[in-house]
Structure formats: C-alpha cells, structure tokens
Swiss-Prot record:
The gene is GPDA. GO terms for molecular function: glyceraldehyde-3-phosphate dehydrogenase (NAD+) (phosphorylating) activity; NAD binding; NADP binding. It is an enzyme of class 1 (oxidoreductase). Belongs to the glyceraldehyde-3-phosphate dehydrogenase family. This is Glyceraldehyde-3-phosphate dehydrogenase. NAD(+) binds at R13, I14, D35, R80, N315. It comes from Colletotrichum lindemuthianum. The active site is at C151. The keyword Endoplasmic reticulum does not apply.
Length: 337
C-alpha cells in the first residue's frame, strides 16, 4: 500500500515530533502543516533544532510559504479556522489534530470541510472514540473523528491490559511522575483554576490531576471504575514514569508477573510494550519508540495479591510514534471496506 498522505494541524511539541517520526515511518507521508502562530521560516527552524531530541536528521529548507523536507515539498498554512484549511488540495486524507484546542467531535470535524476524510486527535477527547494501540485499536469502527487518548493512557493501558487479562485487577491506584509540559510556567504566574499549576515548573514537584485512569476504563471497559490516579509534575524536560499499584484477584509472585509482562512485550504487544532489567534513569529513555517500558527492577510486591508496577514512557516520542501507527491501522481498515 502506498504511504498515506497526512496533514498536521498544530506545530507544537507533538506536531513536530509526529513530523520527525513520520520521516522514519514507511506508511506515512506528511504533505501539509497548519499553524496560525508561526511563519514558515520559524517552523523550519523549530523542526530542525530541538532542545530535547537534537538536530533533525535530514535536510530542511524553505520554498516560499512551503517547507522542503529531504527534497519533498510540504505545504504550510497559517489558518486559524480548521474548516478553511485546504487539505483536499494537498492530498491529505488524514489529519493529526495536535493543537490541543479542537478536541471534541464537533470542533475536530471542521477539518472534514477542507477535504480531510479522517481526523485523529492527539489528546484525550470528551466524546470522540478513543483508541490505544495494542489495547483496543481492533475495535475501530470507521468513525470520522477519533482520539488517541493521552501519552499517559498509552503507557498505562497496555500494562493494565496484561495484568487484567492474566490476573484480573480488583482495583488500583496510579501515579504518573510526569515531566513538565508547555502549559506550565517558567516562573510563578497566574493560574486561576489550578493554583499549584501556576508555580514555576523548573523548581517544583507539583501535584496535579490526570485523566489517564478514567480513559483506561474507556479503552478497557472491564476496568471502568476500578482505577483512579494523580500526577506529580517534576522538573525534567521529557520522559515520564507510571507507578501502578493494584490488587489482583488471582495471586502471583512478582517474578511470575514480570514473566507475564515480558512474554507480552516479546509477543503480541511488541513495539508497544517493552521490558527491561537494565538500571535505566529517565534520560536513557529519550527517543524510545515504545508506549510503555516496564522496569522489572523498580517494581515491588507486598504479597501475591498486591503489587506495584513501574513503567517508563517518552511522553513525546513514544506517543507520537503511536499516532502514526494508529493512522496506518485506520487507513488499512478503511481501505479494506
């Protein structure tokens, strides 16, 4: 199958990292980008130089209002209204909606007016069907607007699926120790709804909320209402880690649980879930393409029915790679109909 042609709306952290990943993805070709807040020259600069992921591995140039990536022209638009972005003219059948603004079906479907056939929201959505690769992508129903949930959900869900399928989760608590993101402050500033969230990101550990456990209940219905959790925002630029503590129905030793996760990582969830016994720290995970990297040495169990599991994720790179994998899956299903 020829590479699917994709447009990106929103050239922030996820938009640019999706683009970088797409250069390496055989099934995807980025043909257009839209961002109303930056000009083409600046977009080229931000794509080329990245403080976390380094210099772009390829050639970037500008031709008028367009980007030229490794000799291929990529249309660049600066429209504020997604309904007027001419996706059809560019050949983009699929759009990655990565502004963080148009996260409902009603808002995201505006892209269809410009000629896009499908929209994938790279964020949680209040009403769009959510799919997580390795967990529930096979239930894709052809909806025109879908969500890939959050980076934390993409880390948590595969791990929870393995444990629930094998041992049945009774209940659980999750904490994500999460790197700071663009919505946080470089210095203390106003944040009316979340006072602590307005404190400087580089100096503080900041308790916060996360919708990831609730989202897991949507992609794994058997876990609906069984998980809840929180976030601790920490002063690191990238890579986060999930701490999942669960009570399980079928008792198992920690070694048995590790083996079950290892088998899943080397089998049906390969490329989504990984297993390691190395003594990693967070920066070692930068650029890791997996959604969830289970740290066998970091977990502990109190007894055979109560266990804490730890799993890393590059909240930018790994998540962006799954966006492309979900796109490829959706396109394959669409083509078979």
């Amino acid at each position: 199958m020829a590479p699917i042609k994709v447009g990106i709306n929103g050239f922030g952290r996820i938009g640019r990292i999706v683009f970088r990943n797409a250069v390496e993805h055989p099934d995807v070709e980025i043909v257009a980008v839209n961002d109303p807040f930056i000009e083409t020259k600046y977009a080229a600069y931000m794509l080329k130089y990245d403080s976390t992921h380094g210099i772009f591995n390829g050639e970037i140039a500008q031709d008028g209002n367009d980007l030229v990536i490794n000799g291929k022209k990529v249309k660049f638009y600066t429209e504020r209204d997604p309904a007027v972005i001419p996706w059809k003219e560019t050949g983009a059948d699929y759009v990655v909606e990565s502004t963080g603004v148009f996260t409902t079906i009603d808002k995201a479907k505006a892209h269809l007016q410009g000629g896009a056939k499908k929209v994938i929201i790279s964020a949680p959505s209040a009403d769009a069907p959510m799919y997580v690769m390795g967990v529930n992508e096979k239930s894709y129903d052809g909806s025109a607007v879908i969500s890939q949930a959050s980076c934390t959900t993409n880390c948590l869900a595969p791990l929870a699926k393995v444990i629930n399928d094998k041992y049945t989760i009774i209940e659980g608590l999750m904490t994500t120790v999460h790197s700071y993101t663009a919505t946080q402050k470089t210095v203390d500033g106003p944040s009316a709804k979340d006072w602590r969230g307005g404190r400087t990101a580089a100096q503080n550990i900041i308790p916060s909320s996360t919708g990831a456990p609730k989202a897991v209940g949507k992609v794994i219905p058997e876990l609906n209402g069984k998980l809840t959790g929180m976030s601790m925002r920490v002063p690191t630029a990238n890579v986060s880690v999930v701490d999942l503590t669960v009570r399980i129905e079928k008792g198992a030793t920690y070694d048995e649980i590790k083996q079950a996760i290892k088998e899943a990582a080397e089998g049906p969830l390969k490329g989504v879930l990984a297993y390691t016994e190395d003594d990693f720290v967070s920066t070692d995970m930068i650029g890791n393409p997996n959604s969830s990297i289970f740290d066998a040495k970091a977990g502990i169990s109190l007894n055979n029915n109560f266990v804490k599991l730890v799993s890393w994720y590059d909240n930018e790179w790994g998540y962006s790679r799954r966006v492309l994998d979900l796109l490829a899956h959706v396109a394959k299903v669409d083509a078979s109909k």
